[in-house]
Amino acid sequence: TTIATVHDALSHNVNERVDFDDVFSSVLRMAAVVASPTGQVSTVLEGSFGVVDADTAQALATVLAELVTNAVEHGLDGRDGRVTVKACRDEDRLEVHVMDDGAGLAPDTLMTGLGTRIVTTLVRGELRGVIDWEPLSGGGTDVVIHARLHQRAARAEA
């Protein structure tokens, strides 16, 4: 599970910080496989998350696993496709895009499901950020997260 993956990474590190790129590569593969029992889904990670603290790692892994799962289950809806996660890190700022090449959002789609509410709460609370769902011009959806990382994690990068 996502939580077990983060805990495993933290167990090898006494300072409670973890290279999230290593953690997330496992989470990304697991989420896509579990969500897509029928279609072939390729997953791509672009950019780098860098080192984050334990609390950030747990919240970020949970949010991203949910977003990748939703992209596969709802965006791709059983067909073959691609989910790309792009991370852009600048000291204590993190921008993440979770993009799929699926059907995209209908113009009147309300993002009110339980998973969406949990993700939004984690992004606003734990990650001190904002999240938006945007349609991609060629089809698909781009979920964009802007987060502020804890200073301790940002200093670990320096």
Language model segments and positions:
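Conserved short strand/loop->alpha-helix "switch" segment adjacent to the catalytic nucleotide/phosphoryl-transfer site
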Residues: V18, V33-V68, V72-R82
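Short beta-strand/loop element within the Bergerat-fold HATPase_c
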Residues: D80-D92
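Glycine-rich nucleotide-binding loop
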Residues: R82, G104, L136-V144
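A short coil/beta-turn micro-motif at the C-terminal edge
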Residues: R89-E91, L136-G139, L149-Q151
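Acidic ATP/Mg2+-coordinating residue in the GHKL
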Residues: D100
